[in-house]
Amino acid sequence: MKPGIHPTYYHDAVVKCACGNTFITGSTKKEIRVEICSKCHPFFTGQQKIVDTGGRVERFRKRFNLEEK
């Protein structure tokens, strides 16, 4: 590695989430702020929301006069 061209690497960088969770990781920034983390993300918490796309399908069928089989 060439000296003087690489950013400083911090082994104790703090990641702060909007939910209040903090953890330590390695990064070129000393502090990182995120909006969502593994403690509050729906995939990890098991509280997934199901997106209702049924209305769009029904509108498509109605537009093209298709019947459900």
Swiss-Prot record:
Write down the superkingdom of origin. Answer: Bacteria
Biological process terms from the Gene Ontology for this record are:
translation
Q: Which PROSITE patterns match?
A: RIBOSOMAL_L31
Q: Output the Gene Ontology cellular-component terms.
A: ribonucleoprotein complex; ribosome
Output the InterPro entries linked to this UniProt entry.
Ribosomal_bL28/bL31-like_sf, Ribosomal_bL31, Ribosomal_bL31_A, Ribosomal_bL31_sf
Which cofactors are required for activity? Zn(2+)
Q: How is the cofactor bound?
A: Binds 1 zinc ion per subunit.
One Gene Ontology MF term: metal ion binding
User: What does it do?
Assistant: Binds the 23S rRNA.
* Assembly behavior: Part of the 50S ribosomal subunit.
Please state what the protein is called. Large ribosomal subunit protein bL31
